[in-house]
Amino acid sequence: MSEPVVDTAELSAEEKKRLLRERRQAKMSKGKATARLNDILSQGSSVKTSGVKSVLDQEKEATPSHDEDPEIQDITEITTPPPRTPPIGEDAPQDIDKIFQSMLQQQGQGADTAGDPFAQIMKMFNQVEGGDSPPSESATSTQDPAELKYRQELLEYNTYNQKLWKFRFLLVRVSVTLFNFFYHYINLSNFHASNYAYVRDLSSEKYPVRDFFTWFATTEVVLVAAYYSIFHSLGLFHAANQNSFVLKAMSMGSMVLPQLEHYKPLVARFLGYYELLGIVLGDLSLVIVLFGLLSFAN
């Protein structure tokens, strides 16, 4: 169907421009935009180039639709936790032990930690871990796992050695006390307990209990002196007191009252001598039980 013939004389200038624009758009829509563009560009040139392509002839890219299903995410990306971001300028710590040791190292480098509760807590943990020996500079600054393992094994060995020597002394004390008691009981017919003071003050020929207590006191002095000498030479005398409830309570209280740190060595020494007194009281309790059984038998 041909377009109707329009008298151009009767058309105004605006209508002429509109008709020309519509004709150009109709030609462009038929795929001739590239040819027309090349004709315009090649005017005045002896060689025609067809390397230019109009944007009207280019295929439009498909617009992504928001109604489409999203891409399925890999399940491993959900189950695998993201890696922990290390601090700036530092490597990522391997485990909680290294973090704790790093905190101890920073606490050991501080000059004045008396008013810092966190520093006092770190110091208390370090003292409990290290036993009776004070933490040296090399011990607090080391980050070598082999060194930390050695310190842990040394602490376990000292604890085992301490229990072993206590058990040995317990066997010796009980054996000596029983031997002293049964020796007098078997060899002396009048060996028995008495409630009267004048009987206990008699000589060993008339009342052999006095001779028994003389030997008992002598052996106790020898055993206590040997116990102190051996434990002090092995470095175990004060180590047994570091895990006592009193020193732990003082370490906790020193976070509030730092003055308690000055009294801890005195309390530790008192607990050590109290342990020696406990040896004598324990052996004396055994003697009381033996004389009680002897009185019940007679």
UniProtKB/Swiss-Prot annotation:
Keyword Ribosomal protein: no
Positions on the Cytoplasmic side per record topology: 1-164, 232-275
GO BP: protein insertion into ER membrane; retrograde vesicle-mediated transport, Golgi to endoplasmic reticulum
Region (Disordered): 40-92
The keyword Membrane belongs to this UniProt entry's keyword annotation: yes
Subunit structure, interactors included: Component of the Golgi to ER traffic (GET) complex, which is composed of GET1, GET2 and GET3. Within the complex, GET1 and GET2 form a heterotetramer which is stabilized by phosphatidylinositol binding and which binds to the GET3 homodimer.
Topology Lumenal: residue spans: 186-211, 297-298
Pfam families associated with the record: GET2 (PF08690)
Name of the protein: Golgi to ER traffic protein 2
Chain's role: Required for the post-translational delivery of tail-anchored (TA) proteins to the endoplasmic reticulum. Together with GET1, acts as a membrane receptor for soluble GET3, which recognizes and selectively binds the transmembrane domain of TA proteins in the cytosol. The GET complex cooperates with the HDEL receptor ERD2 to mediate the ATP-dependent retrieval of resident ER proteins that contain a C-terminal H-D-E-L retention signal from the Golgi to the ER.
Membrane association type: Multi-pass membrane protein
Main location (coarse class): endoplasmic reticulum
Family: Belongs to the GET2 family.
Compositionally biased residues, Basic and acidic residues: 56-67
Biased composition (Low complexity): 42-55
Keywords: Endoplasmic reticulum, ER-Golgi transport, Golgi apparatus, Membrane, Transmembrane, Transmembrane helix, Transport
Gene name in the database record: GET2
Gene Ontology terms: cellular component: endoplasmic reticulum membrane; GET complex; Golgi membrane
InterPro entries linked to this entry: GET2, Get2/sif1
Subcellular location: Endoplasmic reticulum membrane; Golgi apparatus membrane
PANTHER family recorded: GOLGI TO ER TRAFFIC PROTEIN 2 (PTHR28263:SF1)
Transmembrane segments: 165-185, 212-231, 276-296
